[in-house]
Amino acid sequence: RQMCIRDSYIGEDAGKTPYESPEDVDRSNGTLVMATNAEFEPYEYHEGDDIVGIDADIAQAICDKLGYELKIEDMEFDSILPAVQSGKADFGAAGMTVTEDRKSSVDFTDTYADASQVIIVKK
């Protein structure tokens, strides 16, 4: 399901609605809070009053599968790790890179996206 969600934001399928919650989801397990910094389109960004993007859709799909409501908290990027560590948020999703320092304080999922940055010059 992750590839389908990501592909709806990147590539020739971009712009299509990638994920919609089923109407019959039992959300009796409560609410999970996702900490993010909604400034990294297409992973998480503002669309009106909503925070949307690849990470938001993956988080919603997980909550649907586990029976939780999803609450997304937008914050400064440097506040995400402390929010998870303190229990203010249940998890963080914000285009985060795995580092040894971060691995010492939180657990990471498997990688679901790889990015390559480049520098451009005049021809």
Go through each PLM region and give its residues:
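Short, small-residue-biased leader/transition segments that mark boundaries at the very start
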Residues: 1-5
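Sec-dependent signal peptide cleavage junction
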Residues: 6-13, 18
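Extracytoplasmic small-molecule ligand-binding "clamshell" domains
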Residues: 15-21, 25-95
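Short capping/connector residues at structural and topological boundaries
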Residues: 45-48, 111-113, 117
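Ligand-binding "clamshell"
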Residues: 100-115
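A bilobed periplasmic-binding-protein/Venus flytrap-type ligand-binding module shared by bacterial periplasmic
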Residues: 118-123
